[in-house]
A protein has these predicted regions:
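Mid-length scaffold segments of soluble, non-membrane domains
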Residues: 106, 110-112
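Catalytic core of pol beta-like nucleotidyltransferases
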Residues: 4-23, 30-103, 114-204
Length: 204
C-alpha cells in the first residue's frame, strides 16, 4: 500500500475512534487505529493535524440532524454556564469550538481568577459542588493548571480549568498542533449557536 494511502487510512480510523469511542488522546487513537488495521509495527504515523482533518471530514459526512441538535443543545448549556460565571471571563475550549460533538456529555471551559480557592467558594455560594484535579499542558506558561468538574444544566458535565487572572492573554498550547488553543468568549459562542440554529432551520 502506498505510504500516503496508509497514512490516510490510519488518520480516518483514528478519527472514527475519536468520534465513536470518545478517545481524546490523539496518540492513543492512532495506536488503536494501527492495531485495528494491522499496522501496529509502523514507525510513521499521521500527524495530529491529519487526524483532526479526518475528524472534521467524518463529522461533516456522518453527523445527522440528531447529532446537530445535540451539538446545539450543548452550546446553549455552555452559554448558560458562561453567563453564570461571567466574573471568571470564561472561554469555551475543546471539540465544541470546531463543531465536534464528543460521545461524553462534557463541556470544557477556561476561567481566570487569582486563586482556584476563590472559584471553589464562588461555586459553593451558587450551590454547586465540585471536584478538583490538575491538568498538564506541554511546556510554557501554565504547564500545570487546576481544574474543577461539576454537573451543569441538562445533566452535562463541566470541566473548568482555572488559570491566573493574567492567563487570559496567553492560551496554553494545543495538544494537537502545539499552537495556542482556540478560546471562545460568550459572544463567539452565541454566534456558533446562531449558526447551528440556522443549520437546523427547515429550508423553504
Amino acid at each position: 500500500m502506498p505510504e500516503s494511502r496508509a497514512r490516510q487510512r490510519l488518520a480516518e480510523e483514528a478519527a472514527r475512534i475519536i468520534l465513536e469511542e470518545g478517545v481524546r488522546d490523539y496518540g492513543l487513537a492512532k495506536r488503536k487505529a494501527a492495531d485495528h488495521l494491522g499496522m501496529s509495527g509502523r514507525r510513521e504515523m499521521p500527524a495530529n493535524t491529519e487526524v483532526e482533518a479526518a475528524v472534521l471530514e467524518r463529522n461533516r459526512l456522518f453527523a445527522g440532524a440528531e447529532n446537530r441538535r445535540e451539538y446545539l443543545d450543548r452550546l446553549r448549556v455552555a452559554a448558560v454556564v458562561m453567563e453564570r460565571l461571567a466574573g471568571l471571563e470564561p472561554r469555551l475550549v475543546g471539540p465544541l469550538v470546531i463543531g465536534i460533538l464528543e460521545p461524553q456529555p462534557l463541556i470544557n471551559l477556561h476561567g481566570f481568577a487569582e486563586t482556584v480557592e476563590e472559584v471553589i467558594f464562588q461555586l459553593g455560594d451558587m450551590g454547586i459542588q465540585c471536584r478538583s484535579g490538575e491538568r498538564h499542558y506541554r511546556g510554557g506558561q501554565g504547564a500545570r493548571a487546576p481544574f474543577l468538574s461539576f454537573r451543569g444544566p441538562e445533566g452535562l458535565d463541566i470541566e473548568l480549568t482555572v488559570f491566573p487572572a493574567d492567563g487570559i492573554r496567553q492560551a496554553p498550547p494545543s495538544p494537537i498542533d502545539g499552537r495556542p488553543m482556540r478560546r471562545l468568549g460568550l459572544p463567539a459562542v452565541q454566534e456558533l449557536i446562531a449558526e447551528a440554529e440556522a443549520d437546523l432551520a427547515p429550508s423553504d
